[in-house]
Amino acid sequence: MRKLIHIFDKLPSWSASVVVLIVILVLTLDSNPVQIDLPNIVGIDKLVHGIMFGGLAMSICLDIQRRNWSALIGIGSVIVAIVISSVVGVTVEMLQYWIANGRTYETYDIVADVVGAFVLGFMARILLKKYGVE
């Protein structure tokens, strides 16, 4: 697992976050998104939102950690990652509300974005503590 985490070390420190952010923006703002047939499970859309914005929080945590592998990122850095990811989630929902592109605003999407960012942000710290810090 350590080798997998360190494979990104040769890339710029912000690269993982930018890639995840671009994917999220395409999936959430494109008027003709990739058509994925999700199973007809109640709440699957909210789960996907949580995973997307939790993934953004995780990638921000990884990018912060990559600056110094000798010390685990602090709780403050995790909170910053959660806040950034949550702000992006709220912004995306507001853009969906204001831009007539066939997308709709949902308050529960924002809740799912924030919960996903919180859970996976702290999970990133746990995983980095176990596998990443030297």
Regions from the language model: what does each represent?
Residues M1-Y108, V114-E134:
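Bulky hydrophobic segments
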